[in-house]
Curated annotation (Swiss-Prot):
Domain of life: Eukaryota
GO BP, sorted A to Z: cyanate metabolic process
Any one Gene Ontology molecular-function term assigned to this protein's record: cyanate hydratase activity
EC number assigned by the record: 4.2.1.104
UniProt protein name: Cyanate hydratase
Active-site residues per Swiss-Prot or TrEMBL entry: R100, E103, S126
Entries under Pfam families matching the protein: Cyanate_lyase (PF02560)
Length: 154
């Protein structure tokens, strides 16, 4: 199994909690899927906690503390504040996968906006009342496809 780790030199703007969480994740050899199952969130939401891009609930803190053997008071100190979202990646991003996601918005952003406005009227899709997931799909030729679902309240 290949596990996501953290190279802090590539992410100097992440909160202290990121180093704490990623070190424990690596020490325990846990995937985000395993962590998500333990805390009762999906794997993208769990990963967002590690990158400081989502707010941890008191229950998340207790469950992460149990799973990762991190003292609860330390996680309470590091995760109880409000996330400083959007600072973790310079723009435009240099990491190729992150750049491709950015490129999707560059290329299709106005097309998404036009279709969404036609379907829902004037407004915006929430990134607060929001969920997302990643699935793997394999076609009949054996090619793997990434399926990313974005679900936001209108």
């Amino acid at each position: 199994m290949s596990l996501a780790t953290l190279d802090i030199s590539q992410h100097p703007n992440l909160p202290a909690s990121a180093q704490t969480l990623f070190k424990a994740k690596a020490d325990k050899k846990l995937s985000f899927e395993q962590i998500a199952q333990h805390i009762g969130r999906n794997e993208v939401a769990a990963a967002a906690l590690f990158y400081g891009q989502a707010k941890a609930s008191p229950e998340d803190i207790v469950k992460l503390s149990e799973l990762l053997d991190i003292p609860t008071p330390l996680l309470e100190e590091q995760l109880s504040g409000f996330p400083d979202r959007g600072r973790s990646v310079e723009m435009p991003p240099k990491e190729p996968l992150i750049y491709r996601l950015y490129e999707i918005v560059q290329n299709y952003g106005y097309a998404y906006k036009a279709v969404l406005n036609e379907k829902f009227g004037d407004g915006i899709m929430s990134a607060i009342s929001f969920s997302t997931k990643v699935e793997k799909e394999t076609d009949q030729d054996g090619n793997n496809w990434a399926v990313i679902t974005l679900r936001g309240k209108w």
